[in-house]
UniProtKB/Swiss-Prot annotation:
Pfam families: DNA_pack_N. It comes from Psittacid herpesvirus 1 (isolate Amazon parrot/-/97-0001/1997). The gene is UL15b. InterPro entries: DNA_pack_N, P-loop_NTPase. This is Large terminase protein homolog UL15b. Belongs to the herpesviridae large terminase family. The PsHV-1 may encode two large terminase protein homologs UL15a and UL15b. The terminase function was assigned to UL15a since it shares a stronger sequence homology with the other family members. GO terms for biological process: chromosome organization.
Amino acid sequence: MFGRESADLAKKYFESLRKKAADKRFARYEGSAASETPSATGPLLRGGHEELNRGCANAARDGFELAAQPEPRRVTGFQFAVDVSQRFQACIPPVGSLHSCCAASCMFAFAASEALYETLVADSLEAARLKVGAEYKNLANDSGASDGEMAPPRPDSMLGGLRGALDELAFAQYSNADAEAHERVYDGVMAGYSDMICSDEFAQLSDFVFRFAALLKTSFKGTTGAGRGAYYVSPGSNKRRRLNRGNSSRNGYRPREGRLELFQKMILMHATYFAACITLDDESTERMDRYLAEVFNTPLFSSPALHHFKQRTSVFLVPRRHGKTWFLVPLISLLVSCFEGLRIGYTAHLRKATKPVFEEIYARLCRWYGEDRVHQIKGETIAFSFKNGARSSIVFASSQNTNVSIRQLLYGVAAKARCGIDDANGRVSELAFYFCSHGAPLNFLLLSAP
């Protein structure tokens, strides 16, 4: 009910700030002293709490007052707040608390989210690079990427004019007593954010993102012996060498980065969102979605669209030799070596079709981490051991009967992977990818929660 009044108040407040900024620029141009208006942060309405609770919009319109103290205590992190009932407030880091119905809240939320999570992506990739340590050297040698190519600087996602306008905003400051309540709310929100990024589960997610980006730099170099599709070129061929091992000192040539097809990016997004959902707790779901939106460059995905994307089943009709196995081998290898307790099932119509995939994944994991942490059981299961004793596994299965139903095939892999399926209500504790090739039987990949 106060949305329109709050929008009017915010508009009047912005106009007053614009006038003061113009006066300050004019005074600076004339050589006079700088304005004594407090330049630190804070908000806008004081003394309007009771009026807004009673619904007296007319009294609230006259509620503008600047802080009277000449040198108030700086409150770190605050940029905006509205003095209204707590149930009407929304805290947006690193902006602060504002009215949830404020017309400008969308602008603040977008700008703050972009700044916060864009920085988080860069910092998390750098932290993952430092954490990997010796394992990073094996990964870098396998991918052919140098140290500086792992996490290149991201371009600024904001327009220059918008960033300049945000930098020029200066808000009135709260007194110490008024700022304490908003500061507690802000600290509570940021505490949840800090707990997420400091958790071991988020470290697993950031490690996976970093490692996949490193391998994508050179089109998954080293994925030989399996999936010899359109993207496969033998390691000794000149074409492969020109693509990934160009000499940067000669004619300014730089190696070309790998590119994903649309269906490959969708598979990657499905697998990453699923692994993040089963790894992080429910309280971190919204923050995790924002983080992955920055990683996959999908900032315009709405919440309903993202929820539908995570819940739906995807069937990919992909022709032969178009990069299915070329992409799945490094994806499975990274999933099983980054996320603890994950169980993966891979099936094909014939055993000879799963054997090269099994051998390549096993060889890749041994090359990255050594044979002590990788174990194969009866030629159909690969178990990966983490340093803390946790395990993840991959189960390979085949079906000679090409007319077998999807449900029967799913039960077969689930039984070997020892993961249950709730048939009564269709609860999704597994994520399955179905791949159909023209004139070929069905293949699919199954990911199961711990």
